[in-house]
UniProtKB/Swiss-Prot annotation:
One of two assembly initiator proteins, it binds directly to the 5'-end of the 23S rRNA, where it nucleates assembly of the 50S subunit. One of the proteins that surrounds the polypeptide exit tunnel on the outside of the subunit. The keyword Ribosomal protein applies. This is Large ribosomal subunit protein uL24. Signal peptide: none annotated. The lineage of its organism: Bacteria, Bacillati, Bacillota, Bacilli, Lactobacillales. GO terms for molecular function: rRNA binding; structural constituent of ribosome. GO terms for biological process: translation. One of its GO terms (cellular component) is ribonucleoprotein complex. It holds the Pfam family KOW. SMART domains: KOW. The gene is rplX. InterPro entries: KOW (IPR005824), Rib_uL2_dom2 (IPR014722), Ribosomal_uL24 (IPR003256), Ribosomal_uL24_CS (IPR005825), Ribosomal_uL24_KOW (IPR041988), Translation_prot_SH3-like_sf (IPR008991). It comes from Lactobacillus gasseri (strain ATCC 33323 / DSM 20243 / BCRC 14619 / CIP 102991 / JCM 1131 / KCTC 3163 / NCIMB 11718 / NCTC 13722 / AM63).
Length: 79
């Protein structure tokens, strides 16, 4: 896959066209990625031990990898 976790990308298609962000996670099987600050969705969560109140949580949803282009690769300091 051409996108890796940590790369800086720009959305080129869809409702968030023009937005930029860092790749948080990559699913190579479905060709979908999660970009920080892009494709925000509201998730309703039940109360649990970790989140006593529950409620509506806003988080990033995944988008197809073909809808982004890489602006800057993550710098690898292991070389």
């Amino acid at each position: 896959m051409f996108v890796k976790t940590g790369d800086k990308v720009k959305v080129i298609a869809g409702k968030d066209k023009g937005k930029e962000g860092t790749v948080l996670s990559v699913n190579a099987k479905t060709n979908r990625i999660v970009v920080k600050g892009v494709n925000k969705i509201k998730k309703h969560e039940k109360p649990s031990q970790a989140n006593a109140n529950g409620g509506v949580v806003e988080k990033e949803g995944s988008i197809h990898a073909s809808n982004v282009k890489v602006i800057a690769k993550k710098e690898d300091n292991n070389k």
